[in-house]
């Protein structure tokens, strides 16, 4: 048998290493230039909160199947073997007849409920409604996750843009510091101007450090929101919005919320489920009618083996339970009233949340328009102060103040632009995406009812 040479083995080993490194690099690269759509897609797959909400559906599907199982007969196989003392005291007193000592039994018993006050039917309907309610909860969780990811995404953009502004401000102050130092050595400015310029450079350096740390924090927040492993490095591609449309009419948005918000839909389904559970509890007032049958074989050491069977229609009517059924009905009715009040409270809360998000978006939109003018004004003021300072017609404080005003207005413009996108995403979350989150039943059990 021919064996591969050492050279072939080495080439094969190098090829495997290169393939592994390329795959690892590709896997790492996948998270280095994520758009907002990419982040949302990753979060829908990796976020543990959304995965847990989806898995809850499997639990409720199992509840539905458990409730539906009562529509089918219940078969029980029973078997035993026992030994008894031959001199035992027989029923009715002592007898000269020899008693059996060993007994074996094997039998099958079956029970089919014919009527149980419709408890099984309503329990099945309640379980089915609960599954639909959980699907709305999954959609609500998905919408909330989309908002959280969008917020983290634009906060990272904000941190990056702030870092650019801070670095540009540092460069401007360093250049001004060099100019002031030259003027100070030439005797054109005082020591106070020189020291103040150096102080402004130190403050700008501190701002750059804080901006860099803010970028690291924003990346970590985004990575954890997506649900990625701690070893994965995340970065994004994106920029601040350039167009800022109005949020829309508040009344129209509210009417859309009432139709599409998944939380409201879930509350409606929970109320319907609770009303069905009242009918389940009231079913205990009615008798249960069932068909029962059994077939068995008994073997005794005296008498031999004998098959037996029994069958009949049975009715059970609990005419006294100490108030159990009445208490169950009262509990179910109370839960329904609680859900009605909860829905009323959540409608008020959602209306406030929508109004707040609408206000934030509109304020940010107006803030962008105003701050753009402020930035243009401060740029002109800074350039003018710098030109006058070079010609000795302005003091250093004028230039430094112009730098501070310009940097502050740029920060404010970034803040308003990000606030606009976050407010817009918040409105979208409250309104609801009106798209069903995909659900795949688990392999361990459960299917869509």
Predicted regions and their residues:
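Acidic, low-complexity, intrinsically disordered peripheral segments
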Residues: 27-29, 85, 412-449
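Periplasmic alpha-helical coiled-coil/stalk elements that build and connect Gram-negative outer-membrane
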Residues: 3, 9, 34, 144-256, ...
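Bacterial N-terminal signal peptides
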Residues: 11-22
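Metallo-beta-lactamase
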Residues: 211, 262, 416
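Amphipathic alpha-helical coiled-coil segments
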Residues: 52-67, 141, 145-166, 175, ...
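Small/polar-residue-enriched beta-strand and adjacent coil segments characteristic
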Residues: 35, 74-140, 265-347, 353, ...
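Bacterial Sec-pathway N-terminal export signals of envelope proteins
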Residues: 26-76, 80, 86, 230-272, ...
């Amino acid at each position: 048998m021919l064996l591969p040479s050492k050279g072939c083995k080495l080439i094969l080993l190098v090829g495997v290493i290169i393939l592994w490194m390329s795959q690892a690099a590709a896997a790492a690269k996948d998270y280095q230039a994520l758009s907002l759509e990419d982040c949302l897609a990753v979060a829908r797959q990796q976020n543990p909160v959304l995965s847990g909400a989806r898995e809850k559906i499997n639990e409720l599907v199992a509840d539905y199947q458990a409730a539906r199982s009562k529509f089918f007969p219940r078969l029980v196989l029973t078997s035993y073997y026992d030994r008894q003392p031959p001199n035992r005291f027989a029923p009715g007193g002592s007898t000269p007849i020899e008693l059996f000592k060993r007994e074996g039994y094997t039998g099958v018993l079956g029970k089919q409920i014919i009527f149980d006050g419709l408890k099984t039917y309503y329990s099945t309907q309640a379980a089915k409604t609960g599954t639909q309610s959980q699907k709305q909860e999954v959609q609500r969780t998905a919408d909330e996750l989309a908002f959280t990811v969008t917020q983290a995404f634009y906060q990272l953009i904000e941190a990056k843009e702030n870092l650019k502004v801070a670095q540009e401000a540092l460069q401007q102050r360093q250049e001004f510091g060099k100019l002031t130092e030259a003027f100070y050595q030439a005797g054109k400015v005082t020591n106070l101007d020189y020291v103040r310029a150096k102080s402004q450079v130190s403050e700008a350096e501190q701002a750059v450090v804080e901006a860099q740390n803010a970028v690291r924090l924003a990346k970590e927040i985004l990575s954890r929101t997506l649900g990625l492993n701690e070893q994965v490095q995340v970065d994004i591609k994106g920029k601040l919005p350039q167009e800022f449309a109005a949020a829309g009419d508040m009344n129209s948005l509210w009417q859309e919320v009432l139709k599409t918000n998944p939380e409201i839909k879930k509350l409606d389904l929970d109320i319907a489920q609770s009303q069905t559970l009242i009918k389940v509890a009231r079913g205990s007032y009615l008798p249960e009618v069932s068909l029962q049958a059994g077939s068995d074989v008994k073997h005794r050491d005296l008498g031999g083996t004998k098959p037996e069977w029994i069958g009949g229609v049975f009715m059970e009517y609990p005419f006294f339970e100490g108030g159990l059924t009445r208490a169950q009905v009262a509990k179910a009715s109370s839960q329904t009233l609680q859900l009605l009040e909860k829905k009323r409270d959540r409608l008020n809360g959602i209306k406030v949340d929508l109004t707040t998000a609408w206000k934030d978006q509109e304020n940010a939109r107006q803030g962008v328009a105003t701050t753009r003018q402020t930035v243009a004004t401060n740029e002109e003021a800074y350039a003018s102060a710098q030109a006058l300072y070079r010609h000795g017609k302005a003091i250093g404080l004028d230039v430094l103040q112009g730098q501070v005003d310009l940097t502050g207005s740029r920060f404010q413009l970034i803040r308003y632009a990000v606030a606009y996108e976050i407010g817009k995403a918040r409105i979208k979350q409250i309104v609801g995406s009106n798209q069903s989150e995909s659900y795949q039943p688990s392999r361990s059990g459960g299917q869509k009812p």
